[in-house]
Amino acid sequence: MTTMTEQSVQVYAVFIRATAEQVWEAITKPEFTTKYFYGSLIDSTYEPGTPYTGWSTDRSQQYVDGEVIEASPPARLVTSWRAMYDEEAAAEPYSRVTWELEPAGEGVTKLTVVHDQLEGSPKTAANVAGGWSFVLSGMKTLLETGKPLSG
């Protein structure tokens, strides 16, 4: 996994032994996200302009608030992002998350996540700096083994 961590732009990339369609499902289906995304149930219709939200599995706590900016299955998803799990981060401006999927050989997909527009959001930048590596490692493990990385 490659990582570039700066205050305003963070880039993470991983190669996953799965098709782009399988990776897209893992990104967009809550039955997958709860197994690798810190237990978050990601909820969206993935139509531009619609909400993109992350919840605890019982929906008692909202973790992420955002909106779908662009969705081009199974190649690209762009959302706005505001962390709701931390009071200081929730007060910061929205940032942007871009998921890019590209074939990297037969049955292999390169997944790149770019989290940017973090200017003026130091708490969010610090929170997600370690988080994305864990999320992508969890997704890779789940898709390649059928088992979650932790828990």
Region spans (language model):
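Hydrophobic ligand-binding cavity/cleft-lining segments
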Residues: 1-43
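A generic structural micro-feature
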Residues: 4-8, 58-62, 89-93, 105-107
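Short beta-edge strand/loop motif at the mouth of beta-sheet-based domains
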Residues: 11-12, 31-63, 76
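Hydrophobic/aromatic beta-strand elements that line small-molecule binding cavities or substrate pockets
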Residues: 13-14, 64-70, 95-103
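A short, structured loop/turn motif at beta-sheet edges
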Residues: 20-21, 69-76, 100-110
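Hydrophobic pocket/interface hotspot
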Residues: 23-24, 33, 52, 68, ...
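Beta-strand/loop substructures that line and gate deep hydrophobic ligand-binding cavities in soluble
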Residues: 86-133, 151
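Short, highly charged C-terminal tails/helix-capping segments
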Residues: 141-151
